[in-house]
Amino acid sequence: MKNKSKTLFIMSLVFPLLSCGKTNISSTSNSSSTNGSSSSSSIQPSTKNPLLERDMKEIALSFSLNDISSSSINPYIYGTFIEHIETCIYNGIWAEVIMDRKFYCSVGKDVSQWNVSKGQVGDDTETPFEGEHSPILNKDSSIRQRGLSLDQKDYNGYIYAKGEGSLKLAFTIDSEVIEKEIKVSSSDYKKYTFDISSPKQTKRASLEISSLSSPITIDSISLMPEDNYYGMRIDTLEKLKELNAPFYRWPGGNFVSGYDFYDGIGDKDKRPTRRNLNYIGQEKDFNSDSERIASDLMNIGSLGFYGAFEPNDFGLDEFIKMCSYLNAEPNIVINAGLGSLEMAKNEVEYCNGLVGRYASMRPQKESYNVKYFSIGNEMNGDWQLGHVDINTYTQRHNEFAKAMKSVDPNIKIIAVGDNSSSWTQDMVNACKDNMDYSSEHFYAERIEDNIKNHILSMKNQAKTRIEKHRNIQNIGNIKMAIDEYAYMNAEVSSRLKDGMGIISGVNEMIKNSDVVSIACYSSTVNATQGQIATDDFNAYLEGSGYALSIYRDNLKDYYLPVKYKATVGDDYYEIIMTVNKEKNEVAIGVINTTDQILKLTNRLFDEGITQDILEGEFLESSNSVKGEELKRTKRTLNAAYVVAEPRSISVTTLKIR
């Protein structure tokens, strides 16, 4: 640091091209696109620059290296959360084209996604492939599913069948029909493969399956793009790579309190389809079939088929495979609602055990080495399946934790917290020896008509929850895991303004790195203002995703307090700094909601800085509503000063002399 540990740095924002004519700017622009294209340009200085005429606001910042936080920033505060809800997993991460591919509902009945298109179709209830029945296609009978989305690419498929005769699979893609004939000759279920090449992109394809001769029983059909990765959409995975989140929480969320991990392991073609208990209830909850069907139809209409029913195609093994691909730390939430002590213990054995029944069921001999387990989700709330009072739950938590650690004593336990009441205090008092972190969830109110209040809504939620936990932490040195946070009631995709609010909340976590060790934004894909939005053919980074990605890539190491003049009126900007002591670098994060350039310079910074910027023409700009309106740009400047562009989120890295 060259004896500058006590130096007070005063900085004022200056537009970078005000320097000598030798300043060079090299930039790379990236926007979320289907082909991942990017453009780069070298901007040479000119004596007359029209940008100099733009309105610029000068701000003085001061900081001292004596004030560097003693606690390093845990990279897991940039974590994320995926849940089996709506289209987060299925139609988001998972690549399957066929709906209800295992025929959970009898064809043409209840809420089946299949219709009888010709002849008579029965049910084999005596020897079904999986579940309670398998469809029997009698001679010259057929079933159909409409509304399939196919891109202009190659697809691989398969179907299980038994009997003697021929099956015909007819794909109608607009006016073109692609037929595949399969010779079936087996008294037991056998897997038959096929492939098709879609000549065009469409959302109106259909599949008709017909028996051309004697009755044939079918089940578990699948159709996926050839370029899938272990069943996952490659376009979504590439966007997840770009997010660069180091920590993933799964499978819920409210979903987990009705989830049985056994259902999601083993041969995925034989994994059962289940009702999503937390969202649509159990069959016994209804007085009649007609009441249940009416309720299911309503829920499918609002949640989608995969919000109402869980096919269990994406289970624990697939989650671990995804985390491995993304080089991310997995965090598995245990069902402490309707789940049992034995289930919790067995799940840890399945993940980490080297011997035992469940360890032997794992598809690989090596341990998954899952370090972080959460016991339950929001068990403080009466909306949660299995909710009990705090005294009963603390006993349940301790029993679960001891059973799980008897299998692997090295795991870290995240306990259910809620410091908006006395719940967290009571949990820490009773369970401090059986927990390492206390979770906290909050969803901030969206304030559409005032950007400053919109951001402060998130910032103040984070600040309040952290301050309350600080008062509790001393009891047992229990760190905080904010493993769900977002804006509530999000009916639009995540916009630039939402990314700004999320980042403001993250700033509070950075400032309190001695308290907050883990944070998971909710959600990752689709659902509640996902960082990634998908449609049937494309995946896009959204406002929250771009914003968090920029922070994840650049703001690390140690927090450095900084002072500057507060905003006045509805204008809002926010600045945070971190220090990399080994590299003698500081990183400056700026949220600029204004139409002005914020100007920053410091003579003590070395020349040669890098800047990572997210910009939008409007604060409401997003990438999936009206097209790609957000742009992320990385640029290197041979100067010792930077700017914060209007309506932008940026992080600038500068060397300290």
Residue positions per predicted region:
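Carbohydrate-binding surface patches
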Residues: D571-G608, R647-T653
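Extracellular and organelle-lumenal recognition/adhesion modules and their flexible linkers in secreted
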Residues: I43-N312, E329-N331, K345, N391, ...
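Acidic, Ser/Thr/Pro-rich beta/coil linker or hinge segments at domain junctions
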Residues: E607-A644
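Noncatalytic carbohydrate-binding groove/subsite architecture in carbohydrate-active enzymes
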Residues: A205-L212, Y350-C351, D389-G505, N538, ...
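Aromatic/acidic polysaccharide-binding cleft in carbohydrate-active enzymes
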Residues: H84-I85, I478-L555, Y559-I575
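Active-site groove signature of glycoside hydrolases
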Residues: S211, G252, R357-V388, F442-A444, ...
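An active-site-proximal structural segment forming one wall of the substrate-binding cleft
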Residues: P199, P225-A245, N312, F319, ...
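C-terminal motif of bacterial Sec signal peptides marking the signal peptidase cleavage site
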Residues: L18-S19
